[in-house]
């Protein structure tokens, strides 16, 4: 009840009261409702797929009222979509979610010197199924579709401007920081 009311509906936490949809937050929180109503997770997956750019990255957070959000170089956000799709399929045995078609967002890629950009992002004319959305996220995270999102000198994924541990934000904006946590997370998704 608390997760549904305070996190999914109110979009608020003790330290976050801006009312935005957080990409990773909403997906994580909706997974906690899987035994109560798996439809909540299904709906969040579909909703979040519409906040992915064609390059595979996603809005870190957004407001539905004005279609404004923030495009960032956080390294983990984009992987929450394939992770939760895999969890949904494992829990339900229903692969049909992979066939649902949704649009990507339009938006200029961040420049090398940009860490984030807040602006209005609207749906593009490019639509693909959830399976392709997941592939784009994984390819981006592995550096297949964008060399800036690759692995560092120790063979670990680059952290970008942060990973799941927000306390490590901005330790790798020059492309040198790596994330052990992200390595484990990516491995979990790929297996």
Predicted regions and their residues:
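Acidic, mature catalytic/reactive cores of soluble proteins
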Residues: 1-191
């Amino acid at each position: 009840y608390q997760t549904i009311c305070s996190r999914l509906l109110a979009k608020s936490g003790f330290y976050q009261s801006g009312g935005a949809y957080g990409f990773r937050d909403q997906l994580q929180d909706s997974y906690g409702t899987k035994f109560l109503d798996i439809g909540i997770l299904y709906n969040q997956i579909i909703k979040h797929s519409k906040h992915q750019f064609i390059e595979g990255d996603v809005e870190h957070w957004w407001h539905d009222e004005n279609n404004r959000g923030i495009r960032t170089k956080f390294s983990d956000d984009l992987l929450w979509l394939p992770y939760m799709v895999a969890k949904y399929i494992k829990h339900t045995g229903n692969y049909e979610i992979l066939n649902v078609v949704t649009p990507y967002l339009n938006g200029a890629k961040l420049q090398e010197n940009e860490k984030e950009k807040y602006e209005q992002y609207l749906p593009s004319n490019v639509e693909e199924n959830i399976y392709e959305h997941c592939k784009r996220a994984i390819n981006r995270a592995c550096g297949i579709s964008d060399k800036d999102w690759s692995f560092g000198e120790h063979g670990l994924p680059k952290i970008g401007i942060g990973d799941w541990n927000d306390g490590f934000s901005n330790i790798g904006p020059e492309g040198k920081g790596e994330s052990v946590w992200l390595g484990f997370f990516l491995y979990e998704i790929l297996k």
